């Protein structure tokens, strides 16, 4: 009975974590470039009542007798399927087609990665920044990309090349390029908030994509499917309720045992 109670507690903890992840997914259903999370479980250790025995000449083999001791959290994964693309007709809104991440530099000089392509001009110097003011960087992740404030016009090509006509006309400047980065294991990236990811020991080192595909005038939406999340929420809620029932039932049995002696 104590085993069943502890199994119920482990199940409740797991389904609470699942509900936490589902809640975060739903909260970010309209967040640009957001990638949803997924929770998986695995069983805990099993207590062995008796071991397995092989067959003999006079009797057959016997399978092991084991009692499971509950469930545990196996993983919280980030699902990197692409979100739908929303047209904005704004040239600094950039959507990545396929794999890849923009690289931005925070005030401390750290390189972070994002799929959210809503960029803006720094009015002071024409640098391209994200909503937090982090600089979009190009080749080598060192130099902030810049379009002079007095440029007559500009465009961003599908390969990331930035083209602009300087003030007063003249030759089109194409010296800057947005580089998309990729990882051998994107699932190993660490979320740091603000639609940003950080390289980790298990993500592999960022490498430059050879054939980047960028769509100017569009944004990648969240890949959260509300109908799927609501279904998972119902399943998690019922799972939580079922585990509470295990605890209350075990408690009732213990109460009966206590009442045997009056």
Feature-to-residue mapping (PLM):
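Amphipathic alpha-helical polymerization modules
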Residues: 1-142, 146-262
